[in-house]
Design a protein with these regions (language model features):
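Internal alpha-helical scaffold of NAD(P)-dependent oxidoreductase catalytic cores
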Residues: 101, 105-110, 126-164, 175-213
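NAD(P)+-binding Rossmann beta1-loop-alpha1 motif at the extreme N-terminus of oxidoreductases
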Residues: 1-46, 50-53, 60, 125, ...
Length: 218
C-alpha cells in the first residue's frame, strides 16, 4: 500500500514521521505534497519520501490519502482532486470536516475523519476515529493498524469528537506547560535545568502509566 500526504504541516508531518519510524511503512512508499517546498525537501532528504508536484499527483500515486491541509483551503483542494479520486481512501485530520461534510463534498468516496495528536511522533499518540465513515471493513482495519503503529486508537461517536479532540488534541500542550512549571520550581530551588526537565518528564510519564495500569482514580 502507498500512503500519500496532501499537506505536510505539523500534525500531518508528525504522522508521516511516526509511520516511518514505527516501521509500518517505508519512506519510499510515501508520497507527499505541500505548498512549502522547503518542507517537502526536508521530508525527501530525511525520510526518503517521494515529492509530488501537486495534490493530484499524490492522489494518482496512492491508495490511502491523509488530508492534512488547513480548514480554509480544504474545499479548494477537494475541487482539484475530485476528478482523479477513484477508490482511494481519504483519512482527514482537518478540523470541522466530518463525515457529513465529506459526503457533501465528495459523495460516493471512501472517507474517514480522525483526530490525532502530536505524541504520535514518539509512537505514543492518541487517535480518535469518527464512528460514521464510508470505509469498507478491510479499509478501516488497515487504517486502524496504521494508527495503532503510532499509539492508541479510539472509535467514538461523531458528537464526541469535539470534546475528545479538545482533550487528546490540546491536552499535550497543557502537559508540556505543567512539566515546564515543575522544572521551573526545581530550578528555582537549585537544580540544573537539564536535570529538572528529566525529573519532571519522568515523573509525569510514570504517573500517567500508574493511572493506566492500575486504573485507579488519579
Amino acid at each position: 500500500m502507498r500512503i500519500g500526504f496532501i499537506g505536510l504541516g505539523n500534525m500531518a508531518g508528525t504522522i508521516c514521521q511516526g509511520l516511518i519510524k514505527s516501521g509500518f511503512i517505508e519512506g519510499n512508499e510515501v508520497y507527499g505534497y505541500d505548498i512549502n517546498s522547503q518542507q517537502l525537501k526536508m521530508y525527501e532528504h530525511d525520510f526518503g519520501i517521494h515529492v509530488c508536484s501537486s495534490e493530484q499527483d499524490v492522489v494518482k500515486n496512492c491508495d490511502y490519502l491523509v488530508m492534512g491541509v488547513k480548514p480554509n483551503v480544504v474545499e479548494s483542494v477537494i475541487s482539484k482532486i475530485k476528478a482523479v479520486i477513484d477508490q482511494q481512501v481519504i483519512v482527514s485530520i482537518v478540523a470541522g470536516y466530518g463525515n457529513d461534510k465529506y459526503e457533501e463534498l465528495l459523495p460516493g468516496s471512501h472517507h474517514l475523519t480522525i483526530m490525532p495528536n502530536t505524541p504520535a511522533k514518539v509512537l505514543e499518540g492518541t487517535t480518535l476515529f469518527e464512528r460514521d465513515n464510508t470505509l469498507t471493513t478491510e479499509e478501516l482495519s488497515y487504517v486502524q493498524k496504521m494508527f495503532e503503529s503510532i499509539g492508541e486508537v479510539y472509535i467514538i461517536d461523531n458528537y464526541q469528537m469535539v470534546a475528545g479532540g479538545a482533550l487528546s488534541g490540546c491536552g499535550p500542550a497543557f502537559v508540556y506547560m505543567f512539566i515546564e512549571a515543575l522544572a521551573d520550581g526545581a530550578v528555582l530551588n537549585g537544580l540544573p535545568r537539564e536535570l529538572a526537565y528529566k525529573l519532571a518528564s519522568q515523573t509525569v510519564l510514570g504517573s500517567a502509566k500508574m493511572v493506566k495500569e492500575t486504573q485507579l482514580h488519579p
